[in-house]
Amino acid sequence: MIKIIKYSNRLGKNKLISFLDHRRNSNNTDIDLVNKIINDVKKNKFKALKRYEKKYSKNVEIELSKNKISNSIKHLDKDVKKAIDYAYERIFKFHKLQVKNFRKIKLIDKYKNKLEYKSVPIDSVGVYVPGNLPSTLLMNCIPAKIAGVRRIVLATPKINNKLNPAVLYAAKKLGIKEILSMGGAQAIASLAFIQKVNKVVGPGNKYVAEAKRQLSGKILGTETMYAGASEICVLADKNSNLSQVATSLVSQAEHDPDSQCILVTKDKNLTKKVLKEVKKILSNLPRKIIASKSLKKNGLFVLVQNDKQIIETINEIAPEHLELNVKNFKKYENKIKNAGSICNGPNTPMSAS
């Protein structure tokens, strides 16, 4: 189900590089398809958008009424609301500090020239939120609100022909008025040519990422990260909580069939135990089919012999999310140069960050 590579020799290193390159390389068919969708939406606007939504998502309702949104939120579990409220507070506090510190960057040189960093909000931003990820909405929209972005447009696809009430609740909490039920490359094209926002942020599948790449710096503001399917790398040892390790891998695998989930360890027996935990989680997972495809296609266990190989492997993988699920994480953290976010310690899963 999940491939295993021994990193201890040149053959193993080459296998790892080949595994990573296979996923990173663009598919010309995808590029051409996305380009066709973009040009169609640019020319035919809502007519084309509705056609692609019906074709790919069986969705016939793009613009949502206030009543529909309110009715959906009414059925949201109270505990989920509490979790969103708590996450909102944490994210807001962090980014408020970020803006405060940006405004402190000032310098007056010996000639009395004043140099300073000025933070100016753009007028509008489109936020793409995959259907099951209210956290994505919070992490993208809260900074925009704090920065002073006047207009936020939310694009989120339906799952099984339904919008996630948790996403709608988070949007309401942030005062977002423009909520559109759409996904894929057609959603990015719509944000560029119909809603006409200045910039688009938020993760998505390979078609979303490719649409952002093609429009970046042309119609939309330049995007420095196209945020495709999710990536996670977990470092674990015999003292790690294996259920937590397996949960972290599966939690990213369920995002998308192209998500990448990698475990790095010195312990061969640990890989067998983690695989057993993964199978246990999958047996009760609503998104089992997606997660299973992801793990089969892009799941990997890397066996290393020493700490030097751990550092080499992680820096080669350059994961979006890295969990150092070991007690002695401090001996690794300063040597890791290529990782988006790092969760340090055995009780810091990525989902808690």
Where are these regions (language model features)?
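Short acidic loop-to-helix transition motifs that present clustered carboxylates
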Residues: 110-111, 159-163, 182-189, 329
